[in-house]
Amino acid sequence: MAHFMTPEQCRAARGWLDVSQTDLAQAGGVSLSTVRDFEKGRRVPIGNNMNALRAALESKGIKFTENGITGPLAS
């Protein structure tokens, strides 16, 4: 079973990748308000949207763990 992504992990992953909320929303095919509201703790995206956000971050090298996230090393 995939590890659940928290709002804090989402923000940290975006920061690691230097990706804006707008860019993440576009990459995941979700609305900007979905990303914004999730990161502010206002609501949890429905399953398909959560999966799309995770997939967008994972496609850029982010790995979600029980203890947080890991990501690609700077080159």
Predicted regions and their residues:
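The DNA-recognition helices of helix-turn-helix-type DNA-binding domains
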Residues: 31, 42, 60
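A charge-rich, low-complexity, intrinsically flexible signal that marks solvent-exposed coils, linkers
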Residues: 12, 43-45, 66
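Helix-turn-helix/homeodomain-like alpha-helical modules used for DNA recognition
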Residues: 62-75
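Short basic helix-loop element that most often maps to the first helix and adjoining turn
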Residues: 8-23, 52
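DNA major-groove recognition helix of helix-turn-helix/homeodomain DNA-binding modules
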Residues: 48-65
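A detector for short, charged/polar N-terminal pre-domain segments
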Residues: 1-5
